[in-house]
């Protein structure tokens, strides 16, 4: 992403948000901890954050969101004109399938075994099953589903909590980075086809960010000061294949209006420094050595708008705002902006 583009992003970021009323009739979210807003709260899992200091800047306090405030789908929902946050599937009423649900689950991945060492999580396969059950029980019309906005952000854990974690996983010994990315894309293709069969036509597919630049990976796979090139290079292979998959869907699948969101370029720590952030490789909250989540009820940084990362893996609300607006306005999404998907 060029500096010129990010200068535009900075202007958009600081400008007042203008919303012209709800555009899409409903919004459905699938993914992992980047999008989870409470689905893991009652699971037997280490991947849940329904405690302080998470939600430090969120109106309702700790809700299960892996940030100090709003997540990317929260902000995209606001930009799309939704008056209320899309509820987590675990807490939603049946009729809310007409306006949207969030099925995302911290720790989830494309592969079923991903993050199994963390305990229970809702895989992307199960998330789609939950979606099918929800829209079927609520009898949501097919015509309405085709007008809804969909967002899916999955795959990070297949690298963080699988491929680059030697125990209890052996995928790195079995696959080269190219082979592994291809195996994930095969799974992804199947799930996107299933989502399309369930009525989805307007889907924002998020690529992976620069995982090698997260504080967790910088500590475990580098010297703690620079990004892990090995991890980022593996992610780039996956992203290229995912980008191609989205473009292929648009060409071959009837009615598909999928867009690819380039989180890798959009999540460049140097770009965030250029935007005015001051801390890119350190968490805002207190994280114990060898862990990734905030220590409960411990001090956090006062200048949260200057930090890219909230904990050792997840971004601050300020970062989420930049990414959400960049994808919504088409700065890091192609061939459509999410704004186009929401209103067409």
Swiss-Prot record:
Name listed for the protein in its UniProt record: GDSL esterase/lipase At2g19010
Glycan-carrying positions: 303
Stated family: Belongs to the 'GDSL' lipolytic enzyme family.
Any GO CC annotation of this UniProt entry: extracellular region
Organism: Arabidopsis thaliana
Enzyme Commission designation: 3.1.1.-
Bilayer-crossing regions: none
Pfam families linked to this entry: Lipase_GDSL (PF00657)
Active-site residues annotated for this sequence: 33, 311, 314
GO molecular function terms listed in the Swiss-Prot or TrEMBL record: hydrolase activity, acting on ester bonds
GO biological process per UniProt: lipid catabolic process
Signal peptide start and end residues: 1-21
Annotated localization: Secreted
Keywords: Glycoprotein, Hydrolase, Lipid degradation, Lipid metabolism, Secreted, Signal
């Amino acid at each position: 992403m060029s500096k010129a583009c990010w200068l535009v992003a900075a202007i958009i970021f600081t400008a007042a948000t203008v919303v012209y009323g709800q555009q899409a009739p409903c919004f459905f979210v699938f993914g992992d901890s980047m999008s989870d807003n409470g689905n893991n709260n009652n699971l037997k899992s280490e991947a849940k954050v329904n405690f302080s200091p998470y939600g430090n800047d969120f109106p309702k306090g700790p809700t299960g969101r892996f940030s100090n405030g709003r997540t990317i789908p929260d902000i995209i929902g606001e930009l799309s004109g939704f008056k209320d946050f899309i509820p987590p599937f675990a807490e939603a009423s049946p009729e809310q399938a007409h306006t949207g649900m969030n099925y995302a689950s911290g720790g989830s991945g494309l592969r079923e075994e991903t993050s199994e060492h963390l305990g229970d999580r809702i895989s992307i396969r199960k998330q789609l099953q939950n979606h099918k059950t929800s829209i079927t029980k609520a009898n949501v019309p097919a015509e309405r589903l085709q007008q809804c906005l969909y967002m899916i952000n999955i795959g990070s854990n297949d690298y963080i909590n699988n491929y680059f974690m030697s125990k209890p996983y052996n995928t790195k010994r079995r696959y080269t980075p190219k082979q592994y990315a291809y195996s994930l894309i095969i799974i992804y293709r199947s799930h996107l086809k299933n989502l399309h069969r369930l009525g989805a036509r307007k889907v924002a597919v998020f690529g992976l960010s620069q995982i090698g630049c997260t504080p967790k990976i910088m500590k475990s796979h580098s010297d703690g000061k620079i990004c892990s090139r090995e991890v980022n290079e593996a992610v780039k292979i996956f992203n290229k294949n995912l980008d191609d998959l989205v473009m292929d869907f648009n060409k071959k699948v009837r009615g598909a209006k999928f867009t690819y969101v380039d989180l890798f370029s959009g999540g460049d720590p140097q770009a965030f420094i250029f935007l005015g952030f001051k801390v890119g490789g350190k968490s805002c909250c207190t994280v114990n050595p060898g862990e990734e989540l905030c220590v409960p009820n411990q001090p956090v940084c006062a200048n949260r708008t200057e930090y890219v990362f909230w904990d050792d893996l997840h971004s601050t609300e300020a970062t989420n705002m930049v990414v959400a607006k960049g994808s919504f306005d088409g700065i890091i999404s192609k061939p459509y902006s999410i704004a186009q998907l929401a209103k067409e």
